[in-house]
Amino acid sequence: MKQLTLLFLVTITILSCNNNSEDKITIAPDSNNGYLSFEGRDDQFTGGTKMIPIVTPKGTFNVWTKRVGNNPKIKVLLLHGGPGMTHEIYECFDGYFPQEGIEYYYYDQLGSYYSDQPDDLSLWDTARFVEEVEQVRKALGLNSDNFYLFGQSWGGILAMEYALKYQENLKGLIISNMVPSIPDYMEYSDTVLAPKMDPDVLAEIMTYENAEDYGNERYLELVVNHYYTEHVIRMPLEEWPNSIQRGFKHLNPKVYVTMQGPSEFGVKGDATLKNWDVKDRLKTIKTPTLSIGSTYDTMDPKQMEWLANEVQNGRFHLCPNGSHLSQYDDQTNFFSGLIQFIKDVNEGIPL
């Protein structure tokens, strides 16, 4: 846990607070005058924010959500990555969804910064998180007439697992920058991405990896400067958006290390996600599904395309200039594909 805390501290220390203006796609203004109305809503007093009680085997805790907009036919719940990251990495959605009249919900999962953070490692379990999402869905009144579930990275794992158990509640499913197998992700990292690195840099990184010296400041510096800026968000560190900086600053390392492990080159150690794989179950998903991949991601975009073909009703969208956080480093392509999918599903257009 200490090494992950150091990693995020090093990242934040290197980052400046300057923000780069983001590209925007041209979208017609929303003509629905009721999009911002709070009429008939119970969250006006808090500006759309709602704390939702979540029942777990270890007690009841509260998770943070925030609604933006009104649309009875399109409601998108955003599942952040990490695990243990925050909704802050999705703040750029404010630049694209409102003018399309898309209602959407920010949500910090249990353990994340804006929600309760119980000190019990047994809670950081995929199956429990699935039940948490179901409780959030019920509390927000989402159903198969309007409920689109978006998940990126770990959020994509959670979205797949939710669909495998509760797809009857979904209108649409979006899996962004995630493959259906952690072992496949690790193989891609070891056999494809690692050999592309500068040999001297890779050799030095592997010295620390082999020694499990993940807290070494030199290791962290190498990871940030030679891996993050190539495969996590393809921008110079000084141009990383403030929302990303805050997301890293607020990440809960206890959740992250328990599920993901301490290494940035795959899921290692006794991390609970180490052997996660749902490839043989995807064919049971009937919900219209979008898989978003990126050319420079930490994971194989071809596997993301395979995912789209494996589900019964899928579409693949590639962000050719993007990496893991393609909503920032290939923003125009990312949102054009995402918005088009939501529109097509809403209008009944075949994928």
Model-derived regions: residue spans:
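The serine-hydrolase catalytic nucleophile loop
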Residues: G84-G95
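Conserved alpha/beta-hydrolase
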Residues: F97-D116
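Conserved acidic catalytic loop of the alpha/beta-hydrolase fold
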Residues: R128-N146
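Conserved hydrolase catalytic core segment
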Residues: D145-Y188
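Flexible "cap/lid" loop of the alpha/beta hydrolase fold
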Residues: L173-Y214
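Alpha/beta-hydrolase
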Residues: A203-K283, T287
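Conserved loop-alpha-helix segment in the C-terminal half of the alpha/beta-hydrolase fold
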Residues: K279-N321
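Catalytic active-site module of serine/aspartate enzymes centered on a nucleophile-bearing elbow/loop
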Residues: G314-L351
